[in-house]
């Protein structure tokens, strides 16, 4: 079938586009990890296989932002979204209290802008 022939070509054909994409993702991963680790109190290890990072934001738990106590990462994620329009995923939903998921499946420019916004949001906590 045409699907099988396309699959064979994808597996056995030129892999340069795969290598280029891998390099691009590694570059963006390193960028977001560096920018997150520059935020006060945030610890972000580099992931090995995903296109998202899962930094520890527990430093900001039980602090107040805009008159609201940040009890968990649902509160932190909601605060970041409301304050600076950056979407994150709370780690509490994955059983990982204190962590927030950020995707880096976007451009370096958007990552830089988003992390700058998050930095500004955290200044008032």
Task: For each feature predicted by the language model, list its residue ranges.
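PLP-dependent class I/II
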Residues: 1-125
């Amino acid at each position: 079938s045409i699907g099988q022939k396309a699959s064979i070509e994808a597996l056995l054909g030129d892999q340069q586009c795969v290598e280029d994409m891998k390099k691009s993702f590694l570059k963006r991963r390193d960028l977001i990890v560096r920018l997150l680790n520059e935020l006060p109190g945030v610890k972000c290890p580099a992931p090995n296989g995903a296109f998202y990072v899962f930094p520890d934001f527990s430093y900001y738990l039980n602090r107040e932002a805009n008159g609201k106590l940040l009890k968990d990462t649902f509160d932190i994620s909601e605060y970041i979204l409301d304050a600076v329009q950056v979407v994150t995923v709370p780690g509490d939903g994955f059983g990982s209290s204190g962590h927030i998921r950020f995707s880096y499946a976007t451009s370096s420019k958007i990552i830089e802008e988003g992390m700058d916004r998050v930095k500004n949001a955290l200044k008032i906590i």
